[in-house]
Amino acid sequence: IYEGYNHRKEFVTCEQMEHTDQFQDEVYQAARKLCVDNGYKTVLDIGCGSAYKLIKYFRDKKIVGLDLEPNLSFIRDKYPLYDFRESDFSKPPNENFDLVICSDVVEHVLDPDELMNFINEINFKHLVLSTPDRDVIQMLQRSFGWDVNDNGPPHNLMHVREWSFKELEQYVSSFFDIEAHFMTPVQKECQMMIAKSKNI
């Protein structure tokens, strides 16, 4: 992100207990296709939120969901047959995973490098990552008549920062090999990446 951008300095817990598939559904659809096309059997969802989409699309796979309280207690109670764990990015899971999903998480964390390094410590085959595109978000907000500060912090109080399309590509490519980067067709502000580890 460009010099002079104002990042939010405090983390606000993102409670998603009641969310189903109104956001990021296309991300999980694309992740499901990637999983099927490659015969993948194991899926890790970092910041799985309500876990609705994880279970909707991957109930036939071995799945692990990572999140924080209070989301964690909610999804453990709601889906007791699945494996949900608490994670603050300090220690990656020991298992290998075919697919890692990190959907609309990176904009919420104070130190995105910590998240990227956490993912890099996981042995995986493909990563699906998504986050809002700042330029599109700001265009939509202006169309609603909202006050928008081009230099941040984001209008959404739960977002620490937001990347433009080009900025995200530059940032993530320093950690992973990007295979595809595109905007989802229905949720217009969502940019999505498919990537692989540089360690493979």
Tell what function each PLM region has.
Residues 1-95, 103, 113-118, 143-200:
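Conserved N-terminal segment of class I S-adenosyl-L-methionine
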